[in-house]
């Protein structure tokens, strides 16, 4: 990342930090003292009706936090906006200049411990899982002065090794391949238990090396801590290691649709050092839970917002919970010309190749209300003129109904201009 530039306002004078513990007052988690085993977490949360609610659990004597980004309302609180304003707020972040400060790693209140991943409360979520998985580990990679931060699931292999799912051609994968081709290893840090906005930034696809800048924009400013050539945020657990040329079987693992992903050969990360805070809080994302889906899909909302703004007056964008916040979206526009709805559909599908369906509505429709959206479809949409179908397009590998390519659809559920009988009285 370009952290040497003036634009990022690097400052070494004083520390400003936002961390996981700062977020507790916002997330307001239910804190449960009853001790459970690492393979009982999902069933326990279901029994308490807390599967998608912010919680801090006692897993084998260790604190485990979950679901701090499991609703639009909570994400909005971190951003200082309401649930309706998230896409608009996020669409401004990339252009926002924010301060990044760098402090020595020694200024973090952490202790070095022997590397033993088995001592962490790493969870096995479902019986058919390939093993215990770190699901909220942010991999920070550095190569040639460029930094990347992204979330990768990691299957525990032993006390010091994991198999990490690296998706080609995303940035961490490309950095690793470059290192392997030069017969080198990719130096990384894996951080667990950051502020939720740093977690969200790491789930967002931004230009190469811009995750720190994006996180700073989300958080107002960002403090990073330098250890050698590596920069890390304030975290509960920090592991330093390297992604090697060795691979190991990774999977099965439940993805956002609640279905199992396939088993693959994935790179092995070897950890050499481990640091933890006193009484650390381990952070975990439940596969296919609302938080998993939010982190996968909501970062696309500002991208769709910006794409649609190029073709018409966009008011709002949401990804829909029924589509795992990933496959479908609703776009709200202020219609000025006939054809705006169809242009919005085309722009939204172009913004995210994984998007499968788009509904475009007017600004009198409550975009967060499924009933309002269905009302718009029922009273303003005619399939023979308002339905757009795109055949043979590239879709998402996460869609079990797709076979290499997919069909995509769009519904223009906007009112025709200048016609009476469409305005709502109640």
Curated annotation (Swiss-Prot):
Pathway: Isoprenoid biosynthesis; isopentenyl diphosphate biosynthesis via mevalonate pathway. The keyword Lyase applies. Its cofactor is prenylated FMN; Mn(2+). SUPFAM superfamilies: FMN-binding split barrel, UbiD C-terminal domain-like. It catalyses: (2E)-3-methyl-5-phosphooxypent-2-enoate + H(+) = isopentenyl phosphate + CO2. Its EC number is 4.1.1.126. GO terms for cellular component: cytoplasm. Pfam families: UbiD, UbiD_C. It is an enzyme of class 4 (lyase). Mn(2+) binds at residues 148, 211. One of its GO terms (molecular function) is metal ion binding. Gene3D superfamilies: UbiD C-terminal domain-like. Keywords: Decarboxylase, Flavoprotein, FMN, Isoprene biosynthesis, Lyase, Manganese, Metal-binding. It comes from the Archaea. GO terms for biological process: isoprenoid biosynthetic process. The active site is at residue 255. The keyword Methyltransferase does not apply. Belongs to the UbiD family. Catalyzes the conversion of trans-anhydromevalonate 5-phosphate (tAHMP) into isopentenyl phosphate. Involved in the archaeal mevalonate (MVA) pathway, which provides fundamental precursors for isoprenoid biosynthesis, such as isopentenyl diphosphate (IPP) and dimethylallyl diphosphate (DMAPP). This is Anhydromevalonate phosphate decarboxylase.
